[in-house]
Amino acid sequence: MIGILKKVFDVNQRQIKRMQKTVEQIDALESSIKPLTDEQLKGKTLEFKERLTKGETVDDLLPEAFAVVREAATRVLGMRPYGVQLMGGIALHEGNISEMKTGEGKTLTSTLPVYLNALTGKGVHVVTVNEYLAQRDANEMGQLHEFLGLTVGINLNSMSREEKQEAYAADITYSTNNELGFDYLRDNMVLYKEQCVQRPLHFAIIDEVDSILVDEARTPLIISGQAQKSTELYMFANAFVRTLENEKDYSFDVKTKNVMLTEDGITKAEKAFHIENLFDLKHVALLHHINQALRAHVVMHRDTDYVVQEGEIVIVDQFTGRLMKGRRYSEGLHQAIEAKEGVEIQNESMTLATITFQNYFRMYEKLSGMTGTAKTEEEEFRNIYNMNVIVIPTNKPIIRDDRADLIFKSMEGKFNAVVEDIVNRHKQGQPVLVGTVAIETSELISKMLTRKGVRHNILNAKNHAREADIIAEAGMKGAVTIATNMAGRGTDIKLGDDIKNIGLAVIGTERHESRRIDNQLRGRAGRQGDPGVTQFYLSMEDELMRRFGSDNMKAMMDRLGMDDSQPIESKMVSRAVESAQKRVEGNNYDARKQLLQYDDVLRQQREVIYKQRQEVMESENLRGIIEGMMKSTVERAVALHTQEEIEEDWNIKGLVDYLNTNLLQEGDVKEEELRRLAPEEMSEPIIAKLIERYNDKEKLMPEEQMREFEKVVVFRVVDTKWTEHIDAMDHLREGIHLRAYGQIDPLREYQMEGFAMFESMIASIEEEISRYIMKAEIEQNLERQEVVQGEAVHPSSDGEEAKKKPVVKGDQVGRNDLCKCGSGKKYKNCCGIGK
């Protein structure tokens, strides 16, 4: 009875029922679509586009458009989408997340809403986690879309601007999440409208949406420039930290991963660096370097958090196990690890532009996603992205056997049991996939299997290049594959014909802190109704068990006299593990939510600056905007110099000096004239004189040259001030949590101070632009230039070398071309003399 009631009130079930009716409509259209010739089928695309211009909506077209795609897929790809795939497509079109189990054909499902939404001509982005998948899907599914008369583009990291513009101009663009984010940032750093590559963000479908919007949500995309800093302090701090002893000189909390100096450690530091007080303001940099060196030595572990490769520190993604080349830890932690490992210490970088995936993807008009595991994060998707998770039924029932966890007393006992299980299954010819959380675990199991004479493949960040081949062999008879954190998502493990009746065995060597990652590992077995078995092996020494109170259980095992070879198989323990995972997930969600609240402060500021930049780029004449800036600058200067209530205390001389230095010429404004006026009357004659001088300046050159000069000044000032502001906001953010000790809400303080800093930056921009316009010599330097050369810092480049991406430069001028300064001379005889 309860089960029936649950189904009646189950929102998901109601959605499925509603979509089932639409699927029946699509099925009913099949008889009229099937007889069409290829040409008639292609002609449907033009017919749909015309119907849209006459007032029909994409929702009206859905049943017929889906029926057309289904028929085209059957003809072009030899694959006919099932009813459940049509449901998945409907959920995606409605801006939701389709949870479809591994092997249920998510890629084919995506073609349905992609085609329908591409009919509008506004562009559809299909987002994948790496370039291999983007290329694979663009090549395979692109055939279908091109058959139906739509254009398909692929956007890769290595492409030139022209190639990217072509890719984005297509009806459908396949790309990675990183590349989309970086292109957006770069588009807001260009100096000419023609250099932009993206169109307005219309509709995106994200494959492996949980990986991008949850796991990578806290990873900001950064375009950075070099900041020159001394590397010596890192060396000194590293040498000092090596002399410290745990618990005596520093304390380490395993749960929070916090490490800090004790009183003894502080005294030791003061002696070592010959200073009186480590917490004195003049030693802020030293304290920061010591703290980062401590984190590098105590919290960060080689081959778990990072690897050393070709003399560089490369971060390991804790969720996917992939190497994240090109990405660096911030706040000097990366340099501290470089000092620890004795490799070359690289300069800290300065952020020129930054955005998180959370804020980038929220800019799309409509957003949807697909994954095999999203239900556990449903609240987050709904609250942050306004997307519901719809669990799509499987085409065939799942017959996989998910066994209860086996818990051992020690790691040694656990690994012995894992290897024994692998050996037994290998003898029977059953393919085995072993999931590990860290690279060192996969290498340990590999050594143990080698001793037993079992041939196997390892799939981790170190040999990422062979990933697709290893996954392709993983379902063959007797295959043993060890994978770190399910690297290889997006590639199916297909079973060999001779073992279809046995299925794949999945063995987990540790529970991940996220249930989703465990579910992804389980989901590799039993795809499309195949048999399969999954089993997790745990030990009391696993990190998750250590962090969440396994001491009582360990004591109980000791009391019962259990040895290492006897596991506990208990639902109670499995429930305890699951509740620990829920707690960690809750903590992680709170952290991401908090990050978003902080990032929203910068997002609002970024939108203001980027919108103004866009207006400047598109505007033919900036004079009106600049006059407004001059007016504000003058009013601020007058207010600043006439603050006192008593007239004698006004600093009129200081005001005149300021105006002479920054905006006007000597004698333009006289002290005695201003003394006769009230503060609110002073601005008017000053502004009138400024406009007169502005007019004089305009007469000195052709109008076109003057307009370009204005743009050069505005871009140079805005970009310089904005990058300095981002850096200042970074520093504010780093120290703001300390305000909590004074019973002050850090977020509110960050919002208020961030707003005050933004206001002050705007004032500074207006003042500097006014000064340059009135005081700069115009003959030289008329070409728009980037303030700093920027380079994309990839949060993950899937093990491939991150290519340096300088921010675009203006067009090159030939020596015999007319000089861009407007003099009418050839470049070689003008600004290019001596070049």
UniProtKB/Swiss-Prot annotation:
**Record membrane topology:** Peripheral membrane protein
Outline the segment boundaries, as ranges, of region: Disordered.
788-807
Q: Which Pfam families match?
A: P-loop_SecA, SEC-C, SecA_DEAD, SecA_PP_bind, SecA_SW
Cofactor: record remark: May bind 1 zinc ion per subunit.
Q: Which SUPFAM superfamilies match?
A: Helical scaffold and wing domains of SecA, P-loop containing nucleoside triphosphate hydrolases, Pre-protein crosslinking domain of SecA
The catalysed reaction is:
ATP + H2O + cellular proteinSide 1 = ADP + phosphate + cellular proteinSide 2
Q: Which Gene3D superfamilies match?
A: Helical scaffold and wing domains of SecA, P-loop containing nucleotide triphosphate hydrolases, SecA, preprotein cross-linking domain
Catalytic class of the enzyme: translocase
User: Which sites bind Zn(2+)?
Assistant: C819, C821, C830, C831
Q: A GO CC term?
A: cytosol
InterPro entries (UniProt xref): Helicase_ATP-bd, Helicase_C-like, P-loop_NTPase, SEC_C_motif, SecA, SecA_CS, SecA_DEAD, SecA_motor_DEAD
Give the molecular function GO annotations.
Answer: ATP binding; metal ion binding; protein-exporting ATPase activity
Q: Which GO terms describe its biological process?
A: intracellular protein transmembrane transport; protein import; protein targeting; protein transport by the Sec complex
- Entry's family note: Belongs to the SecA family.
Function recorded in the entry: Part of the Sec protein translocase complex. Interacts with the SecYEG preprotein conducting channel. Has a central role in coupling the hydrolysis of ATP to the transfer of proteins into and across the cell membrane, serving as an ATP-driven molecular motor driving the stepwise translocation of polypeptide chains across the membrane.
- State the protein's name: Protein translocase subunit SecA 1
What organism is this sequence from?
Bacillus thuringiensis subsp. konkukian (strain 97-27)
Could you read off the lineage of the organism from its UniProt record?
Bacteria, Bacillati, Bacillota, Bacilli, Bacillales
Q: In the UniProt record, what gene is named as encoding this protein?
A: secA1
